């Protein structure tokens, strides 16, 4: 199954959070900080959003930093993804 985002939305897959601290302490699932780094897996077409033309600046494969608590998390075929607006992406990691 493929996800096709609409308008100015992108689909990202979060990079796994560290399971150990720098000092070697193993963190339980709830104690791990949610990652804010992800890989873009699909990009919407852009278009007119709220009266403004939106040009998509992201491409599939980009590694990005996104705002905490943004987007909608979905699980498809056992994989977890987040769908969010391009404006919720803060930076591209090069």
Curated annotation (Swiss-Prot):
Highest taxon above the source species: Bacteria
Protein keywords: Chaperone, Cytoplasm
CDD domains: cpn10
GO-annotated biological processes: chaperone cofactor-dependent protein refolding
InterPro entries: Chaperonin_GroES, Chaperonin_GroES_sf, Chaprnonin_Cpn10_CS, GroES-like_sf
Keyword Acetylation: no
Keyword Chaperone: yes
A single cellular component GO annotation: cytoplasm
Gene3D superfamilies: GroES chaperonin
Major location (coarse): cytoplasm
Compartments, record wording: Cytoplasm
Single GO MF annotation: protein-folding chaperone binding
Biological function: Together with the chaperonin GroEL, plays an essential role in assisting protein folding. The GroEL-GroES system forms a nano-cage that allows encapsulation of the non-native substrate proteins and provides a physical environment optimized to promote and accelerate protein folding. GroES binds to the apical surface of the GroEL ring, thereby capping the opening of the GroEL channel.
Record text on subunit structure and interactions: Heptamer of 7 subunits arranged in a ring. Interacts with the chaperonin GroEL.
Similarity annotation: Belongs to the GroES chaperonin family.
Protein's recorded name: Co-chaperonin GroES
Organism: Clostridioides difficile (strain 630)
Gene field: groES
């Amino acid at each position: 199954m493929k996800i096709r985002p609409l308008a100015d939305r992108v689909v990202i897959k979060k990079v796994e959070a560290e399971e150990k601290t720098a000092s070697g302490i193993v963190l339980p699932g709830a104690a791990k900080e949610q990652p804010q780094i992800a890989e873009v897996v699909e990009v919407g077409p852009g278009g007119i959003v709220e009266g403004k033309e939106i040009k998509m600046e992201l491409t599939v494969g980009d590694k990005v930093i996104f705002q905490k608590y943004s987007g909608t998390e979905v699980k498809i075929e056992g994989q977890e993804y987040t769908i969010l607006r391009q404006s919720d992406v803060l930076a591209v990691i090069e």
